[in-house]
Amino acid sequence: MAGSKEEFIEWTLKKEWKKLLRYLWTPVDGFINIPTGTLHAIGKGVLTYNISRNADLTLRLYDYDRIDPSTHKKREIQPQEVFENVNIPDKKIEFQMFPASYEFGCKVTRYWDEPGLYTLFRLQIDENGKFLHDRFAFYTCVKGKGTINGIPIRQGETVFVPACMGWMYFKGNMDLFLASYRNENV
């Protein structure tokens, strides 16, 4: 990892990726929070659930020389913009493992719940369960299928639930991520 912006730019221009990047082993069920301004990439075979602030900006420094299917050219990179926005030196971040608890038929893993940033839980349901969440939430099915309050959901689909809906009742065998947000420290 580069210790200064000058070193970062030098290693980038020389394409010395092994000096510039840290490669992390991805544990099954591991969680990692990647703060804004952190240079990162997702390796082959890794399933991610990305939650980000309201922004329509992605800057690329390196893109594995992938071809854009619509233009048939290499995807654009923006090294100068990256140099201006990346955190240098960067904080060392690692994958974390969180314990699960069993609540009303759901295996619940609470990954993150930071006011002003995001909330992320994992709910694993085997046949039946229920869960109470008092804020709006997006429930995304990452494995299996079932219903949420009678609404069908299957892998790759998301259901939005407004705030103050009360208990969510689940039927089926499914693995869900619950993503939400809160302003206050409650």
Whereabouts are the PLM-identified features?
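Active-site region of the double-stranded beta-helix
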Residues: 1-28, 43-84, 91-145, 151, ...
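Glycine-rich, small/acidic residue-mixed loop/short-helix segments
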Residues: 172
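Short, charged beta-turn/beta-strand-edge "cap" motif at the junction between a beta-strand
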Residues: 38-41, 165-168
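Glycine-rich, charged/polar anion/phosphate-binding loops
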Residues: 34-36, 106-107
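Short small/polar-residue motifs
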Residues: 105-107, 163-166
